[in-house]
């Protein structure tokens, strides 16, 4: 007799008993229902909190227009179009800036079928689609491991509405990964068990294109998955099978490398990598609470991404730390664990648990990124769902005792609510260390209620032929209720600060048409993130992790923090002149605060469309020349607080570049490195303005400038340096000099000069060749196996 939980030939799509489309429909309907109350409250423009509001809505809307050419015009100099985004921080290559977020997502490309203005209202329908696709993929994977196909439907719902997925609605594009991953694992199983060819290569390519960052983790997980299954002899491995699998792996990577090569070259310039000298940090987390949080995240429903119920230490917020299965938690998986010996699923989950508890192993899922994340948990969650349905289907498995045990573990967390605490300052005593008692009660209540209902259903209906269907209905009802509460806690927790989000975003579209013509940057003061994207303007306030890497060196050199956002303080007034900021935008309610903080360089321009606009009297058009320079070594010896002032006076060259280009400028005297006051800044702006380009035009592949010089000199542009740029002076290619620790300059001769900077992602030619070549090979490879299969049938 075949063991429960082992691989078997699945039903094919279209057969009478197959329930693929039923699963897709159930997942879509459930997702639509729990989003519906918020969709109605928000009038169709669903906004949540944090990253969803600031990034995801803005990115989807902006990129829809950018791809369609709705932003800056095409360059008249080149045939290269739609490669450079001015609205992304100080300007960034669009492929590298958005390949982590959406550039390779099939859901984003599907959204291009709709007008740009619809996108804020399509965020929920797109999420519903993602949940539906996730359910379909999980069903395809799980049906191999069950006897009754209804259990595959149940397992798919457990995966689709896991704590990980619901939590990551906050990040939106993480749900894309959850949706597509099951197809990758299904195709691997098809290759291992059924010798089915080409599908694995296809899904490798799709997942790689969708998100290169998550794909790194998928490679690690697939290696664990393959080795664990091989170690338990779940399939027969031959040299031919291994060779074909390796070939399809490489072929899939080749097909999916269109975004990979440019992304890798960009990441190599990004300082957010692991510190290889961390010693104990390889093996242990610095806070005990981190371990407790990891363990609890596998058994209890998740907190809101930006609110913790219990933990006061460790890296907890925004980490996607949840492996919770709706209703049953790990009860079914633990039951399976106790019932099976030498099972591959146990080894996979056990290995993942070890990886979760060891920092260096956990970071392996993110190419040794130094920041802690748990954004790979969706992969073991799929295996946990398989273990759960296998335990439920096997009538000999004890389901009740694991459920009771996990219930007691949940109840044990009440200790955090009643432990006595003495205030170190007053000496008074209180009870509990909870950070958000209300959320904790909701999370604990759902966890215990789910297990109680799970035990009741198992005791009452386990012997019934419709047990799986009844449990599926309970899981979906539970998922609906918990998702409404979970999203509600996150959404209404920021309702006061985000209630005017829609108004500000839509008003920005009106203001876009009322700002003066010209190509300049803007700044904002105490309004919502990424308003510059709605204005289609480069803005100093920007929230996004993957802007041009040189920005991550330019800002810190000035003492401006740059991690996942750019937000130079208003007190750093000299940055506004250096970066060619002409207008600052705030709301009428914040005008008094702005007036108290701002320097004398702002004059009131007008109030319109719900905004108050100020003009920078020290505005310097983009593209200007200097009289002085100083070396990077000298620059690093100056005080960070006044470096922006210094950059208005002198160009900073590396020691090597100073030896080449220093002859065109005068070395800045030591005495002039200290006279860095507002009054001297105004004079420096006046001098730079006198040397500025007469024409500066932004386009969607870079920019064009025209300038007249009295002598041969470097012309500076406050555009982030990127290896993808090529500069042309009067039609001739010229070298680009990296200056000011991250910006650009180019040497121009005396007289009139026409300057064009054209951007193509570094490595794009190689990536295109790999992708096109891979597709050709894959088509031939697939055609061969289709032909062979038909010939075999005829024979």
Indicate where each model-derived feature is located:
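Start-transfer (signal-anchor) and selected internal transmembrane alpha helices
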Residues: 1-40, 244-245, 452, 466-476, ...
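Membrane-interface helix-loop-helix junctions at transmembrane boundaries of multi-pass membrane enzymes
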Residues: 234-243, 333-356
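Membrane-embedded helix bundles of polyisoprenyl
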Residues: 27, 131-144, 150-231, 244-264, ...
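Soluble catalytic regions of membrane-associated enzymes that act on cell-envelope
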Residues: 113, 471-713, 717-725, 730-734
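Contiguous transmembrane helix-bundle modules in multi-pass membrane proteins
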Residues: 194-195, 214, 345-506, 752-795
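Periplasmic/ER-lumenal interhelical loops and adjacent helix-loop junctions
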Residues: 53-57, 61-76, 106, 241-242, ...
């Amino acid at each position: 007799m075949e063991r429960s939980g082992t691989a078997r030939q699945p039903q094919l799509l279209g057969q009478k008993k197959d329930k693929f489309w039923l699963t897709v429909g159930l997942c879509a309907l459930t997702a639509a229902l729990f989003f519906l109350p918020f969709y109605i409250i928000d009038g169709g423009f669903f906004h949540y909190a944090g990253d969803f509001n600031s990034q995801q809505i803005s990115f989807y809307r902006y990129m829809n227009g950018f791809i369609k050419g709705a932003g800056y015009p095409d360059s008249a100099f080149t045939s290269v179009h739609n490669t450079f985004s001015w609205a992304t921080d100080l300007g960034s290559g669009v492929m590298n800036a958005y390949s982590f977020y959406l550039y390779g997502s099939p859901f984003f490309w599907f959204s291009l079928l709709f007008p740009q203005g619809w996108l804020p209202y399509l965020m929920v329908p797109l999420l519903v689609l993602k949940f539906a696709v996730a359910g379909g993929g999980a069903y395809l994977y799980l049906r191999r491991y069950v006897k009754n196909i209804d259990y595959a439907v149940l397992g798919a719902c457990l995966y689709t509405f896991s704590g990980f997925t619901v939590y990551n609605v906050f990040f939106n594009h993480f749900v894309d990964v959850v949706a597509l991953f099951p197809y990758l694992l299904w195709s691997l199983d098809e290759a291992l068990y059924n010798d089915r060819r080409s599908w694995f290569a296809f899904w490798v390519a799709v997942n790689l294109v969708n998100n290169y960052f998550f794909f790194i983790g998928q490679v690690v997980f697939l290696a664990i998955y393959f080795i664990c299954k091989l170690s338990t002899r779940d399939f027969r491995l031959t040299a031919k099978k291994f060779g074909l699998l390796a070939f399809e792996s490489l072929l899939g990577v080749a097909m999916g490398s269109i975004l990979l090569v440019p992304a890798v070259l960009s990441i190599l310039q990004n300082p957010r990598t692991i510190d290889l000298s961390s010693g104990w940090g390889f093996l242990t987390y610095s806070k005990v609470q981190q371990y407790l949080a990891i363990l609890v995240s596998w058994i209890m429903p998740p907190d809101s991404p930006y609110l913790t119920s219990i933990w006061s230490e460790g890296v907890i917020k925004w980490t996607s730390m949840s492996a919770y299965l709706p209703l049953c938690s790990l009860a079914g998986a633990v039951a399976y664990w106790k019932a099976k010996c030498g099972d591959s699923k146990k080894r996979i989950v056990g290995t993942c648990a070890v990886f979760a508890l060891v920092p260096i192993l956990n970071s392996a899922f993110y190419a040794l990124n130094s920041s802690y994340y748990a954004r790979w948990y969706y992969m073991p969650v799929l295996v946990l769902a398989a273990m759960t349905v296998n335990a439920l289907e096997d009538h000999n498995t004890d389901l009740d005792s694991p459920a009771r045990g996990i219930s007691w573990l949940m109840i044990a967390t009440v200790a955090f609510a009643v432990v006595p605490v003495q205030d170190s300052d007053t000496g008074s005593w209180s009870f509990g260390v909870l950070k958000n008692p209300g959320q904790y009660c909701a999370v604990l209540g759902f966890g215990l209620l789910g297990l109680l209902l799970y035990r009741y259903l198992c005791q009452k209906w386990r012997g019934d032929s419709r047990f799986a269907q009844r449990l599926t209905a309970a899981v979906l009802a539970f998922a609906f209720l918990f998702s409404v509460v979970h999203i509600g806690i996150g959404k209404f927790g920021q309702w006061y600060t985000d209630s005017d989000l829609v108004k500000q975003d839509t008003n920005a579209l009106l203001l876009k048409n009322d700002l003066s013509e010209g190509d300049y940057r803007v700044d904002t003061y105490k309004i919502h993130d990424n308003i510059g994207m709605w204005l289609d303007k480069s803005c100093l306030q920007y929230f996004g992790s993957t802007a041009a890497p040189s920005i991550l060196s330019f800002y810190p050199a000035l003492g401006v923090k740059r991690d996942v956002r750019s937000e130079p303080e208003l007190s750093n007034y000299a940055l506004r002149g250096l970066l060619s900021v002409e207008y600052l935008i705030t709301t009428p309610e914040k005008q008094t605060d702005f007036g108290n903080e701002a320097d004398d360089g702002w004059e009131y321009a007008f109030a319109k469309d719900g905004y108050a606009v100020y003009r920078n009297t020290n505005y310097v058009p983009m593209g200007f020349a200097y009289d002085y320079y100083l070396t990077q070594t000298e620059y690093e010896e100056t005080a960070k607080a006044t470096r922006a002032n210094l950059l208005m006076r002198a160009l900073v060259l590396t020691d090597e570049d100073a030896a080449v280009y220093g002859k065109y400028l005068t070395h800045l005297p030591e005495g002039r490195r200290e006279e860095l006051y507002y009054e001297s800044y105004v004079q420096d702006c006046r001098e730079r303005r006198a040397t500025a380009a007469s024409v500066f035009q932004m386009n969607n592949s870079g920019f064009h400038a025209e300038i007249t010089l009295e002598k041969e000199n470097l012309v500076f542009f406050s555009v982030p340096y990127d290896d993808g740029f090529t500069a042309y002076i009067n039609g001739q290619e010229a070298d680009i000099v990296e200056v000011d620790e991250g910006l650009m300059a180019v040497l121009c001769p005396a007289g009139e000069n026409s300057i064009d900077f054209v951007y193509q992602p570094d490595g794009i030619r190689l990536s295109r060749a790999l992708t096109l070549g891979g597709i050709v090979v894959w088509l031939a490879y697939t055609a061969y196996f289709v032909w062979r299969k038909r010939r075999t049938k005829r024979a």
